Amino acid sequence: MLNMNLQLLASKKGVGSSKNGRDSISKRLGVKRFDGQLVTAGSIIVRQRGTKIHPGTNVGKGSDDTLFALVDGTVKFERKDKKRKKVSIYPVAIAE
Protein backbone atom coordinates (compact mmCIF):
# COMPACT_ATOMS: atom_id res chain seq x y z
CA MET A 1 0.00 0.00 0.00
CA LEU A 2 1.12 3.54 -0.74
CA ASN A 3 1.70 5.75 2.23
CA MET A 4 1.42 9.46 1.27
CA ASN A 5 2.85 12.10 3.54
CA LEU A 6 1.24 15.43 2.56
CA GLN A 7 2.54 18.46 4.41
CA LEU A 8 1.10 21.97 3.96
CA LEU A 9 3.59 24.70 4.74
CA ALA A 10 2.60 27.98 6.30
CA SER A 11 2.02 30.52 3.55
CA LYS A 12 0.36 33.86 3.05
CA LYS A 13 -1.12 35.08 -0.17
CA GLY A 14 0.49 38.28 -1.50
CA VAL A 15 -1.71 41.29 -0.75
CA GLY A 16 -1.58 44.28 -3.10
CA SER A 17 -1.30 47.77 -1.71
CA SER A 18 -3.90 50.42 -2.40
CA LYS A 19 -3.19 52.93 -5.15
CA ASN A 20 -5.08 55.65 -3.30
CA GLY A 21 -4.15 57.36 -0.05
CA ARG A 22 -2.22 60.41 -1.31
CA ASP A 23 -3.11 64.05 -1.58
CA SER A 24 -1.14 67.14 -2.51
CA ILE A 25 -1.01 70.15 -0.20
CA SER A 26 -3.23 73.07 -1.20
CA LYS A 27 -1.54 75.98 -2.97
CA ARG A 28 -3.64 78.71 -1.30
CA LEU A 29 -4.54 80.38 -4.59
CA GLY A 30 -7.23 83.04 -5.05
CA VAL A 31 -8.06 86.67 -4.39
CA LYS A 32 -6.31 88.00 -1.27
CA ARG A 33 -7.55 91.64 -1.35
CA PHE A 34 -11.09 92.35 -2.52
CA ASP A 35 -12.75 95.28 -4.32
CA GLY A 36 -12.72 98.48 -2.28
CA GLN A 37 -10.03 97.37 0.18
CA LEU A 38 -7.06 99.61 0.94
CA VAL A 39 -3.64 98.14 0.13
CA THR A 40 -0.04 99.20 0.54
CA ALA A 41 2.60 98.94 -2.19
CA GLY A 42 3.83 95.36 -2.50
CA SER A 43 0.62 93.77 -1.18
CA ILE A 44 -0.42 90.59 -2.97
CA ILE A 45 -3.85 91.03 -4.53
CA VAL A 46 -4.34 87.72 -6.40
CA ARG A 47 -2.43 84.41 -6.37
CA GLN A 48 -3.21 82.51 -9.57
CA ARG A 49 -2.03 79.96 -12.12
CA GLY A 50 -2.14 81.66 -15.52
CA THR A 51 -3.64 85.11 -16.05
CA LYS A 52 -7.26 84.54 -15.03
CA ILE A 53 -7.21 88.18 -13.92
CA HIS A 54 -4.94 90.62 -15.77
CA PRO A 55 -2.93 93.47 -14.23
CA GLY A 56 -4.40 96.95 -14.69
CA THR A 57 -3.26 100.39 -13.53
CA ASN A 58 -0.62 100.36 -10.75
CA VAL A 59 -0.59 96.54 -10.58
CA GLY A 60 2.48 94.37 -11.25
CA LYS A 61 2.65 90.73 -12.31
CA GLY A 62 5.16 88.27 -10.82
CA SER A 63 6.82 85.36 -12.63
CA ASP A 64 4.18 82.97 -11.19
CA ASP A 65 1.34 85.29 -12.39
CA THR A 66 0.79 86.73 -8.90
CA LEU A 67 -0.70 90.23 -9.05
CA PHE A 68 0.60 92.80 -6.55
CA ALA A 69 0.12 96.50 -5.80
CA LEU A 70 2.75 98.96 -7.07
CA VAL A 71 1.33 101.91 -5.07
CA ASP A 72 -0.76 102.48 -1.95
CA GLY A 73 -4.46 102.78 -2.78
CA THR A 74 -7.83 101.13 -3.25
CA VAL A 75 -8.39 97.85 -5.13
CA LYS A 76 -10.81 97.95 -8.07
CA PHE A 77 -11.81 94.89 -10.13
CA GLU A 78 -12.91 95.81 -13.67
CA ARG A 79 -13.63 94.28 -17.08
CA LYS A 80 -10.77 94.60 -19.57
CA ASP A 81 -13.07 93.54 -22.41
CA LYS A 82 -15.97 91.14 -22.82
CA LYS A 83 -13.98 88.07 -21.74
CA ARG A 84 -11.12 89.33 -19.58
CA LYS A 85 -11.03 90.81 -16.07
CA LYS A 86 -8.40 93.17 -14.69
CA VAL A 87 -7.55 94.60 -11.31
CA SER A 88 -6.30 98.15 -10.78
CA ILE A 89 -5.12 100.19 -7.82
CA TYR A 90 -6.33 103.79 -7.54
CA PRO A 91 -4.31 105.99 -5.17
CA VAL A 92 -6.27 107.53 -2.31
CA ALA A 93 -6.17 111.34 -2.22
CA ILE A 94 -4.66 112.40 1.12
CA ALA A 95 -6.63 115.23 2.77
CA GLU A 96 -4.32 117.72 4.46
From Swiss-Prot:
GO terms for molecular function: structural constituent of ribosome. The N-terminus is cleaved by ribosomal processing cysteine protease Prp. SUPFAM superfamilies: Ribosomal L27 protein-like. One of its GO terms (cellular component) is cytosolic large ribosomal subunit. One of its GO terms (biological process) is translation. It comes from the Bacteria. Keywords: Ribonucleoprotein, Ribosomal protein. Residues 1-9 form a propeptide. NCBIfam families: L27 (TIGR00062). PANTHER family: LARGE RIBOSOMAL SUBUNIT PROTEIN BL27M, RIBOSOMAL PROTEIN L27. Belongs to the bacterial ribosomal protein bL27 family. This is Large ribosomal subunit protein bL27. It comes from Clostridioides difficile (strain 630) (Peptoclostridium difficile).
